[in-house]
């Protein structure tokens, strides 16, 4: 009996150890960067990923993030993340601090997605929207492309793409990425959507690059709480670094076809967030507006 008990305890301990080890093994890597397509950078990263496991699926989120624009990288991850299956591995390379002491991390969200990225603010909107369960520091002694130790300017290929591939292929567990972070992630401050003094306030988080519509972070629930109605008219003001750049009265509509060509309208975009457009025009270009954490918007009932 004592021998049987010891074997049981040993097996039970191994079971607990194995069951607490989290493997992604989704076989999916979603890749975004500010590299563009004019050189071989994107192809190099993909080559590294396929070299780890040829069966991996690589999806390009975008490689047209404006150079060094960490905020837009954060937004595009937030935009795409909810449509991917659990355990998918995102790798984001917008890394103006490459080769410095900024941290290289893998974050696991509460909804079971993995994000491989420099800890430079890229995780801001992922954390706010989905919550980050754990962050691990990438152990570069173990998870770095062979022969790249003297390369200091392409962590996207040598560390991030390589680590993402190993995680997605199930070659390493999340715990094997490296030690748990003992510091909070770097976050970019911005105006959260609120109703304050009977005014709806938020941030212009992104532009629709094709059509020039401006998208805010003001969601459908807050719009309903404020009492916005179809065909209602509202005073809209836009500020950049606290300087007013736009002011006009705009009507709220369900879709573009509810207005005449050239008319401005407030509407709910595909993410059910408040947006502004010019019907068959480019609102942002027309009014010289942009997006980011320093672009604020207010909506007020007439």
Region locations from a protein language model:
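A residue-level signal for conserved active-site and pocket-lining positions in enzyme catalytic cores
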Residues: 34, 163, 279
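A conserved acidic, glycine/proline-rich C-terminal tail/linker
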Residues: 214-289
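Bacterial N-terminal signal peptides that target proteins for export
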Residues: 2-13
């Amino acid at each position: 009996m004592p021998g049987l008990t010891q074997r049981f305890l040993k097996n039970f301990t191994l079971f607990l150890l194995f069951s607490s080890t989290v493997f992604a093994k989704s076989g999916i890597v979603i890749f975004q960067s500010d590299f563009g397509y004019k050189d071989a950078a994107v192809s190099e990263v993909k080559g590294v990923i396929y070299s780890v496991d040829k069966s991996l699926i690589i999806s390009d989120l975008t490689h047209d993030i404006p150079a060094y624009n960490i905020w837009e990288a954060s937004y595009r991850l937030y935009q795409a993340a909810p449509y991917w299956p659990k355990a998918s591995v995102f790798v984001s390379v917008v890394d103006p601090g490459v080769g410095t002491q900024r941290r290289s991390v893998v974050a696991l969200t509460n909804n079971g997605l993995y994000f491989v990225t420099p800890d430079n603010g890229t995780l801001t909107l992922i954390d706010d929207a989905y919550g980050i369960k754990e962050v691990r520091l990438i152990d570069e002694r173990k998870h770095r492309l062979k022969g790249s130790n003297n390369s200091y300017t392409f962590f996207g290929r040598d560390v991030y793409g390589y680590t993402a591939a190993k995680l997605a292929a199930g070659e390493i567990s999340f715990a094997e990425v490296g030690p748990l972070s003992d510091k909070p992630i770097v976050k970019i401050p911005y105006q959260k959507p609120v109703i304050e003094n009977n005014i709806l306030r938020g941030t212009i988080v992104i532009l629709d690059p094709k059509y020039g519509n401006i998208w805010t972070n003001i969601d459908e629930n807050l719009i309903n709480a404020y009492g916005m109605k179809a065909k209602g008219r509202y005073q809209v003001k836009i500020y950049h670094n606290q300087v007013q750049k736009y002011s006009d009265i705009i009507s709220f509509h369900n879709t573009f076809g509810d207005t005449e060509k050239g008319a401005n309208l407030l509407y709910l975009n595909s993410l059910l967030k408040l947006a502004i457009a010019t019907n068959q025009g480019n609102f942002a270009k027309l009014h010289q507006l942009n997006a980011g954490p320093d672009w604020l918007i207010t909506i007020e009932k007439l």
